[in-house]
């Protein structure tokens, strides 16, 4: 049983100064009326208190927030008697276990979860008033004894609840134990207070005090120091503990400090790759084990290596137990499926979804539903980088040989040369129709016009002071590498969207990279045609991280570029981020990238076929594409018409299987007004924003975050993707808050210059010297002082 006193925390500032007292009690009550949602979660997640209760004020927290509390360390909810209906709602509607909801009855809260104890109002004490004397009084007021000597039977256990010994306590020893925070008892043989370890050095840190169910015995939870509790130098007065997991942890901690260099355990600690490999090996052997004996044997091996990893990283079994305790408290649990790489892949026929191809529908007032709808897929950055890093390093070190090896491995094509040099052979244009040439020529010309208009024609000059002329002028980035994805679609449009601005900006060398076709080892003739039109010098016949690495570092036949641009899958993006941060590469990138996305805002007057076609044109990019429709005052009839149009059009598309899977996680969000819809769009920051609303042009001024905007019913995203003239290389994953889409300036850098006359030096020189002196940079100051002295602009004795 815990002590009947319940410390109340109404501000976290008081916690640190009183932490040791609360730890001794083992329970705490968080004041929900004073603490914020964030403060409650911070405390319950981070602080190791066995019992964390929360007083729940009426109406302050949403259902989702309350569930989050219970899922993250709050054990019980204390509810005032007048709010009994709240308790009913939690139990009946949210399926919160009844024992975790404590309703006040006659001024008493009867806690039933984890520990059974009644807490009266007078025992709920502000943490600010908590003191050692108060704790001593509570312990002595709770425990009783029928022994003639007035001593209290005391069981001493360690932090793992293992019995160390049976001793006795007196009132004075209890007071001293609380005062010192140490294991202090009463010695019957010496007839005096006994501070454990005072002479032997085997002391104890006191962690918690509690009583048994009848309050006639005490339990001290302690952290034992040095060799053990018993005078015979064993951990327990009942003999040594069985080795077990705690014993193994103790042994490994010792081995971490003193294992010989040639020992296997030392090798494991020194070689993390070996340790990780052994954990995976033993885990696999455990899954293959049969029968009780073999299973227990393989589990023991796995525990050994897992514990070695914990010890090597300063993680204790207690830390693991705390996590298990936290998970035990959860009232909602994960689905529990294994990661795809650990389960057999179902056949394609089994993967196909069935039924109508419809979007989910949520109201804007449903905050949880909206948050789910606007949430982007989680990028497993660390896992992806773990796969990408070796590829980059191998290409960097081995050049073409590594590139050819990866092309054969990942693209299924065995090449003798990874580079196609200009002028490109005629055979690479086979299959290119005149109709396609005309379409590409029109698109190239429109993109050229729009991007040429962005090209600065004059140097920017500003005279900031008389005689101080500042200027800024553009220069092309000399060598650029343009990544053209392959995969599930041929994308000559990406080639022209990147190649044309590079040509307009007058980059000296343009290098394409695109994965070769498995059928013949070539890239599509459309991509080669665009490469020729924009003056590309080379096409690297490779994709993925290996292509990025080849352009970033250069190989025997591939020039090192200064900037890499272009979309790609998560491996391409990870590789771009890697080389951008590697000073050896000295290579920048255009922007981070994620799955393609569209947000359409439509009202009751929107053409349902137009809306459906815009949604589907994005959905066919891939199953991870983001497709969101924000409806403004849509009727039920209109919503159904849109759903029907999506279904009927989708069935006509060759990539219907991809579309079906994408639409399965896509959503219609219903708003009450245009401003609310635009606010939601700005929060999401879509790659593509389509406005299919009345007077669409009037609302463009409300757009703050978007890659590109498509205004009005007759402006489908497809036009911007191919031929209108704007660029389709746009920021995704919410990066439209910080990044622009590709443009002419993307392929340029801007250099500043200044030209200062003697008059100008006189006007700004004293300011320069003043600031330089303050910063302690005398060299900077002297560079101005010497010039001004020679010009006679300052006295010779100027300091």
From Swiss-Prot:
Its cofactor is Zn(2+). The keyword Protein biosynthesis does not apply. One of its GO terms (molecular function) is histidinol dehydrogenase activity. The keyword Transferase does not apply. One of its GO terms (biological process) is L-histidine biosynthetic process. Present with 521 molecules/cell in log phase SD medium. This is Histidine biosynthesis trifunctional protein. It comes from Saccharomyces cerevisiae (strain ATCC 204508 / S288c). The lineage of its organism: Eukaryota, Fungi, Dikarya, Ascomycota, Saccharomycotina.
């Amino acid at each position: 049983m815990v002590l009947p006193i319940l410390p109340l925390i109404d501000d976290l500032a008081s916690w640190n100064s009183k932490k040791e007292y609360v730890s001794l009690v083992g329970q705490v009550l968080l004041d929900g009326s004073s603490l914020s949602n964030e403060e409650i979660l911070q405390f319950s997640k981070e602080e190791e208190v066995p019992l964390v209760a929360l007083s729940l004020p009426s109406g302050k927290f949403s259902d989702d927030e309350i569930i989050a509390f219970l899922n993250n360390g709050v054990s019980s909810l204390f509810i005032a008697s007048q709010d009994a209906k709240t308790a009913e709602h939690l139990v009946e509607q949210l399926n919160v276990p009844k024992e975790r909801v404590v309703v006040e009855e006659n001024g008493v809260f009867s806690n039933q979860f984890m520990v059974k104890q009644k807490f009266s109002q007078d025992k709920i004490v502000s943490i600010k008033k908590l003191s050692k004397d108060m704790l001593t009084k509570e312990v002595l007021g709770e425990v009783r004894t029928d022994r003639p000597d007035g001593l209290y039977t005391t069981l001493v256990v360690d932090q793992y609840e293992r019995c160390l010994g049976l001793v006795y306590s007196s009132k004075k020893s209890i007071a001293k134990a609380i005062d010192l925070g140490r294991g202090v008892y009463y010695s019957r043989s010496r007839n005096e207070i006994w501070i454990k370890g005072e002479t032997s050095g085997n002391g104890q840190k006191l962690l918690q005090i509690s009583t048994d169910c009848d309050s006639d015995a005490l339990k001290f939870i302690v952290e034992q120091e040095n060799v053990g509790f018993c005078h015979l130098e064993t951990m327990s007065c009942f003999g040594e503990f069985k080795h077990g997991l705690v014993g193994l942890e103790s042994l490994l901690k010792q081995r971490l400090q003193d294992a010989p260099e040639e020992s296997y355990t030392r090798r494991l600690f020194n070689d993390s790759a070996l340790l990780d490999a052994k954990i995976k090996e033993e885990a696999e052997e455990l899954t293959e084990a049969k029968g009780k004996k073999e299973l227990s044997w393989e589990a023991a091996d796995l525990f050994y290596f897992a514990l070695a990893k914990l010890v090597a990283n300063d993680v204790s079994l207690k830390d693991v137990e705390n996590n298990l305790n936290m998970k035990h408290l959860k009232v909602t649990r994960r689905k529990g499926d294994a990661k795809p790489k650990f389960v057999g892949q179902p056949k394609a026929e089994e993967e196909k979804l069935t039924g109508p191809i419809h979007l989910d529908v949520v109201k804007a007032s449903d905050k949880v539903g909206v948050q789910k709808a606007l949430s982007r897929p989680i990028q497993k950055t660390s896992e992806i980088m773990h796969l990408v890093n070796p590829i980059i390093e191998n290409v960097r070190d081995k050049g073409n040989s590594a590139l050819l090896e990866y092309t054969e491995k990942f693209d299924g094509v065995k090449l003798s040369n990874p580079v196609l040099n200009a002028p490109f052979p005629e055979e690479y244009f086979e299959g290119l129709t005149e109709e396609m040439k005309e379409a590409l020529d029109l698109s190239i010309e429109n993109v050229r016009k729009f991007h040429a208009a962005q090209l600065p024609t004059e140097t920017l000059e500003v005279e900031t002071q008389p005689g101080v002329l500042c200027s800024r002028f553009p220069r092309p980035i000399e060598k650029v590498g343009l990544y053209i994805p392959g995969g599930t679609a041929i994308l000559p449009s990406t080639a022209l969207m990147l190649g044309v601005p590079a040509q307009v900006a007058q980059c000296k060398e343009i290098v394409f990279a695109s994965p070769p076709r498995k059928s013949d080892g070539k890239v599509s003739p459309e991509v080669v045609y665009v490469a020729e039109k924009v003056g590309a010098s080379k096409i690297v016949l490779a994709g993925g991280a290996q292509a990025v690495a080849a352009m970033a570092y250069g190989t025997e036949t591939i020039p090192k570029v200064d900037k890499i641009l272009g979309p790609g899958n998560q491996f391409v993006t990870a590789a771009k981020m890697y080389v951008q941060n590697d000073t050896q590469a000295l290579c920048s990138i255009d922007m981070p990238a994620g799955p393609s996305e569209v947000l359409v805002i439509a009202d009751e007057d929107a053409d349902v076929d137009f809306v459906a076609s815009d949604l589907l044109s994005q959905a066919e990019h891939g199953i991870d594409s983001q497709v969101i429709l924000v409806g403004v005052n849509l009727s039920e009839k209109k919503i159904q018409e849109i759903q029907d149009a999506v279904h009927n059009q989708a069935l006509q598309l060759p990539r219907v299987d991809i579309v079906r899977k994408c639409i399965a996680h896509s959503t219609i969000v219903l708003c009450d007004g245009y401003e609310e819809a635009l606010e939601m769009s700005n929060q999401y920051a879509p790659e593509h924003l389509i406005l299919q609303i009345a007077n669409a042009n009037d609302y463009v001024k409300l757009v703050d975050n978007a890659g590109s905007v498509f205004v009005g019913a007759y402006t489908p995203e497809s036009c911007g993707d191919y031929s209108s003239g704007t660029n389709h290389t746009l920021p995704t994953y919410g990066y439209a808050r910080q990044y622009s889409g590709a443009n002419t300036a993307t392929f340029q850098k801007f250099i500043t210059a200044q030209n200062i006359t003697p008059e100008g030096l006189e006007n700004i020189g004293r300011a320069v010297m003043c600031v330089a002196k303050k910063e302690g940079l005398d060299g900077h100051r002297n560079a101005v002082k010497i010039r001004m002295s020679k010009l006679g602009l300052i006295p010779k004795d100027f300091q």
